[in-house]
Amino acid sequence: MTTAAAPSLRFRLPGSWVALDPRDADTAHAHSARIAREIIGPADDAAALRRRVQSGLDDASAAAREASAHLLLMCREIAPGVPTPVAISVHTPVEVTPTVGTAPEAVMRAFTASLPHTAERDLETATRTDAAGSAVLRLHSVTAQLIEEDGSTVTQNRLVARYWYTVPGRKQVALVNMTTPLGDIPHAMLRFFDAIVAASSWSEPVSG
């Protein structure tokens, strides 16, 4: 007896993005460097700013690897001439127990009730929404990162938003993690992230 393949999330992303396997650290690092150059430019006097952007993308790819994400998406630009450093990682669904049935609200209630007993952070930021036929819970944080630049330390604020989707027809939730070094404008970036979630959909597996 074989287990039916799970549906997968699909995103309608604005602009130009690169899809990567987060397990390939060298390729992810090369794309981080390339995107930083495209966003900031190649000028020598912009080297410090390039390092900040690249550091944010490198951190996102490292976090995706550590969390065993199966897909990493890096934004090159959200519109022609509008480069934006954003990374999205998509993670394998996890089981939620105990859950009565597979209705999105039932699964989300069980998942939400379990959170205080887990290592999940930022529960005070919890925001509920619906998207793609799923119940979705958003948690977010803005953290200060210290970056060494030419003998001095610079602080950069990083925004991380974690979206937990219920998986259609299953007692599961799937994590989509969105991050950007543009943490100084969190409200604008959260609106952008929310719009990506609102436009997402589930793709049913193709039967063999």
Question: Which residues are covered by each model-predicted region?
Answer:
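Short acidic, Gly/Pro-enriched loop/turn segments at secondary-structure junctions
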Residues: P22-I35, S207-G208
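Active-site-adjacent "gating/activation" loops or surface patches in catalytic cores
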Residues: V167-K171
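Signature of long, low-cysteine stretches enriched in small and polar/charged residues
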Residues: A62-Y163
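Short, well-ordered beta-strand elements
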Residues: A87-H91, Q172-P181
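Mixed-charge, low-complexity intrinsically disordered segments
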Residues: A30-A60, H140-S141, V154
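Soluble, non-membrane globular domain cores that form compact, hydrophobic packing
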Residues: T2-P7, P205-S207
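Proline-anchored loop/turn motifs at beta-strand termini and strand-loop-strand connectors
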Residues: P7-D24
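Surface-exposed amphipathic alpha-helical segments
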Residues: W17, L175-G208
